[in-house]
Structure formats: structure tokens, C-alpha cells
Amino acid sequence: MGFNIISAAEAASYVKHGYNIGLSGFTPAGTPKAVTPEIAKIAEEEHAKGNPFQIGIFTGASTGDATDGILSRVKAIRYRAPYTTNPDFRKAVNNGEIAYNDIHLSQMAQEVRYGFMGKVDVAILEACEITPDDCRRRYCSDHCAIGR
């Protein structure tokens, strides 16, 4: 079993309006940085056409500007949990533009696993390297694609 290498834009195309996405990372260090700006571009394009485009975001903690900032500014976040520190995101929450659940970080995995947050439609992970051995060991699904 192998894996497909696709562009960040193609990886973002898997994310549709209304989806819930799970993002890796605990602070900006492990958060995806290439795909989320491409999701923001899709949101801008859809909004320019008069179409809705908003997603739910589940993370391990705060993600930084490459996710919470850019997606807040283009009004692409419908729901977000848990903790985050981005000022653009906080402003959008305080203006009633984003539904936010500030649950404790230790509760997030169980909430998602038990289905209390709804299903995760797409997971986007930051990775330094994925090797063919990783895929042979089944660390990658049959639908694994790498966005660069």
C-alpha cells in the first residue's frame, strides 16, 4: 500500500461546507499550516458566489493564525472547540459569528470519540515525513493523501 502526494489545494478540496474537521497539533507547532489557508481560499470563493461555506473545527488546543486567524477572517468557522488564543477568532466569537465550546482540553478526545461533537468528516495532520514503511504498518489508511 502506498500513499498519494497531492497539493495542499487538492487536500483542501476534500473539505465541504458543513463538514467537521479534526486538526492535529497542540499549539501552532503541530498544527497544519499548508492546507488551512487553502480552505480559506475556498471559503472566500464560495462566499463571493453567494454560497455558504463554514466548517466545524476540533483540535487539541490553540492552533495559531494559520488556522484560527485566517479562517475567522474569511468567516469560514461555524463551530470550534476547544481552547484557542487567536485575537481574530475571539473577536468573531464575541460578535456572535462563531459558536465556541471552551471545554477543558482533557475532555476533547472523549467528547469526539463518543460522538457528542458530531462526526469528524476530514482529519488534517501536520507531518514531517510519512514513509512506505508507515503505510505497510497500517499507520496510513487506504485513503491517505499527503498535501504539500
Predicted regions located by residue number:
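Conserved alpha/beta enzyme-core scaffold
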Residues: 1-148
